Structure formats: structure tokens, C-alpha cells
């Protein structure tokens, strides 16, 4: 998987730079998202792993995408097909999203709780995370009954576990040692 990250990075960077230059970040993110979904399709994945000529592969892929790709998007697909890189399209999308978030100084923050949080609670969490990370945050709320109570907050590789489940697990670790 880390090899996919390495392979995808230059394609994501090129697409991102082109999108910024042409003020088309939303359009490019949508094109990449659609292309990534197509690449994840089982039948397309089989086609990508088969012995199909790159030109035919690009034509088929572009035909499946239809009018979801503009000319520049089609060119990206052609280049990736020529280099046998279409299977990494989902990772290209992820890298593109990360580059965009860095440009916009935003970070995705996952907030996992046992119950739905109020707007006031969410705004307090957002304010605290913005202060801690020195960036704007976008909260992604998820409900997981296994946390019992409290919240688990994830931002990149940082995890703040304020859940009852987390406390019980830490207590069990202390008692076992």
C-alpha cells in the first residue's frame, strides 16, 4: 500500500497543480472521485489487471467515465494507462484531497461518540481542535455505541480518547502489568 502512495504522489501533485492554476479544484476533485470509483469497480479492476493494450485500456476507461471527465482529465487517464498506473487512482484522489486540505489550511477531524452530539458540543470540540492544530477543522461525526460514553477524536495520526471504553482498556492494562 505504501508503494501505491509513492506511485500516486506525482500524479496527484500534477493534477493538483493544474487544478490550482486553472482554479478548478472542485471540478478536479469530482473527476478524480468518479475515476477512483470506476477503478474500484470489480469488472474494471479485472480489466486493469489484464493484458489489455494501454491505448485500449484508456479508451475503455474514458468511455466508462463518459462526460464526467473533461479533456485534461482524459489526458491524465491516458498518461496513467500508458504507465500502467490506473489501479492507483483511489490513492491519487486521497493525495489530491490531502494537498487541497493543506492549501486550504483545513484538517479532517473524526469525532466518534456513543450518541449524537449537540451543536454546542460540536462547536466546542471544533474550537478546541482549531486552537490545538492551528488550522481550520472539518468535523466528521460518527456514532459508535461501543465507546459507551465520551468521545474519541482523531486528526491525522493524533488520537484523543476520552471514551469510557478507552478508560476501561487503560485500566485493564494497568491491572495486568
UniProtKB/Swiss-Prot annotation:
A cellular component term, taken from the record's GO annotations: plasma membrane
Pfam families: OSCP (PF00213)
InterPro entries xref list: ATP_synth_OSCP/delta_N_sf, ATPase_OSCP/d_CS, ATPase_OSCP/dsu
Keywords: ATP synthesis, Cell inner membrane, Cell membrane, CF(1), Hydrogen ion transport, Ion transport, Membrane, Transport
Transcription among keywords: no
Membrane-related topology note: Peripheral membrane protein
Superkingdom as given in the UniProt entry: Bacteria
Gene Ontology molecular function terms on file: proton-transporting ATP synthase activity, rotational mechanism
SUPFAM superfamilies to which the protein is assigned, alphabetical: N-terminal domain of the delta subunit of the F1F0-ATP synthase
Cellular compartments annotated: Cell inner membrane
Assembly behavior: F-type ATPases have 2 components, F(1) - the catalytic core - and F(0) - the membrane proton channel. F(1) has five subunits: alpha(3), beta(3), gamma(1), delta(1), epsilon(1). F(0) has three main subunits: a(1), b(2) and c(10-14). The alpha and beta chains form an alternating ring which encloses part of the gamma chain. F(1) is attached to F(0) by a central stalk formed by the gamma and epsilon chains, while a peripheral stalk is formed by the delta and b chains.
Family from the record: Belongs to the ATPase delta chain family.
Function: F(1)F(0) ATP synthase produces ATP from ADP in the presence of a proton or sodium gradient. F-type ATPases consist of two structural domains, F(1) containing the extramembraneous catalytic core and F(0) containing the membrane proton channel, linked together by a central stalk and a peripheral stalk. During catalysis, ATP synthesis in the catalytic domain of F(1) is coupled via a rotary mechanism of the central stalk subunits to proton translocation. This protein is part of the stalk that links CF(0) to CF(1). It either transmits conformational changes from CF(0) to CF(1) or is implicated in proton conduction.
Family matches, as NCBIfam families: ATP_synt_delta (TIGR01145), PRK05758.2-2 (NF004402), PRK05758.2-5 (NF004404)
Record protein name field: ATP synthase subunit delta
Biological source species: Pectobacterium carotovorum subsp. carotovorum (strain PC1)
Underlying gene: atpH
Amino acid at each position: 500500500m505504501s508503494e501505491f502512495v509513492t506511485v500516486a504522489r506525482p500524479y496527484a501533485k500534477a493534477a493538483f497543480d493544474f487544478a490550482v492554476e486553472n482554479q478548478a479544484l472542485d471540478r478536479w476533485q469530482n473527476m478524480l472521485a468518479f475515476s477512483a470509483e470506476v477503478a474500484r469497480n470489480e469488472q474494471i479492476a479485472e480489466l486493469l489487471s489484464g493484458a489489455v493494450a494501454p491505448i485500449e485500456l484508456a479508451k475503455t476507461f474514458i468511455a466508462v467515465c463518459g462526460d464526467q471527465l473533461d479533456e485534461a482529465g482524459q489526458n491524465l487517464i491516458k498518461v496513467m494507462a500508458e504507465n500502467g498506473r490506473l489501479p492507483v487512482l483511489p490513492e491519487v484522489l486521497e493525495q489530491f484531497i490531502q494537498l487541497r486540505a493543506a492549501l486550504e489550511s483545513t484538517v479532517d477531524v473524526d469525532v466518534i461518540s456513543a450518541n449524537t452530539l449537540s451543536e454546542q458540543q460540536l462547536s466546542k470540540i471544533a474550537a478546541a481542535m482549531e486552537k490545538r492544530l492551528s488550522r481550520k477543522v472539518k468535523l466528521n461525526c460518527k456514532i459508535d455505541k461501543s465507546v459507551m460514553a465520551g468521545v474519541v477524536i482523531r486528526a491525522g495520526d493524533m488520537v484523543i480518547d476520552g471514551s469510557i471504553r478507552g478508560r476501561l482498556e487503560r485500566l485493564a492494562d494497568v491491572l495486568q502489568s
